[in-house]
């Protein structure tokens, strides 16, 4: 029984899934916006928010924990120098997930996950 087991397996083994999360979080911080499937976006949201919280703490221990997870040293520097100070007054909710329809090849539901800095303006609905 899988009672109280949180998280999605996403059809991958543990090591593959963890590597994918590390790659996606690194890309999210490098580009500040990525397009992925709904399930992956929902899973990396919690990891990304924890990394930003580490960046807000800003001490050496937090830097080392983040560097052990994020794959590129330049992205760790960006997280601690530009991304984390942007959210020093915000107590969580650093990312936004926007649903963008389905993928052409397999109709998988797709989303954009981005860092909340720019104001979101929804498209005008056709009346």
UniProtKB/Swiss-Prot annotation:
Q: What PROSITE patterns does this protein's entry cite?
A: RIBOSOMAL_L17
GO biological process annotation, one example: translation
Signal peptide stretch? none
> One GO MF term, please?
structural constituent of ribosome
Question: What are the GO cellular component annotations?
Answer: cytosolic large ribosomal subunit
**Keywords per UniProt:** Ribonucleoprotein, Ribosomal protein
Presence of the UniProt keyword RNA-binding in the record: no
| Known partners and oligomeric status | Part of the 50S ribosomal subunit. Contacts protein L32.
Which family is this protein grouped under? Belongs to the bacterial ribosomal protein bL17 family.
Identify the HAMAP family for this entry: Ribosomal_bL17 (MF_01368)
Q: What name appears for this protein in its UniProt entry? A: Large ribosomal subunit protein bL17
Q: Which organism is it from?
A: Pelobacter propionicus (strain DSM 2379 / NBRC 103807 / OttBd1)
- Which gene specifies this protein's sequence? rplQ
């Amino acid at each position: 029984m899988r009672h109280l087991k949180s998280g999605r397996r996403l059809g991958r083994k543990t090591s593959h899934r963890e590597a994918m999360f590390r790659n996606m979080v690194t890309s999210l911080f490098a580009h500040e916006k990525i397009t992925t499937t709904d399930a992956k976006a929902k899973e990396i949201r919690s990891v990304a928010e924890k990394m930003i919280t580490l960046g807000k703490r800003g001490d050496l221990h937090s830097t080392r924990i983040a560097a052990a997870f994020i794959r590129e040293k330049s992205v760790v520097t960006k997280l601690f120098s530009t991304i984390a100070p942007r959210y020093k007054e915000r107590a969580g909710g650093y990312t936004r997930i926007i649903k963008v329809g389905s993928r052409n090849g397999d109709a998988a539901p797709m989303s954009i996950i981005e860092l909340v800095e720019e104001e979101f303006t929804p498209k005008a609905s056709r009346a």
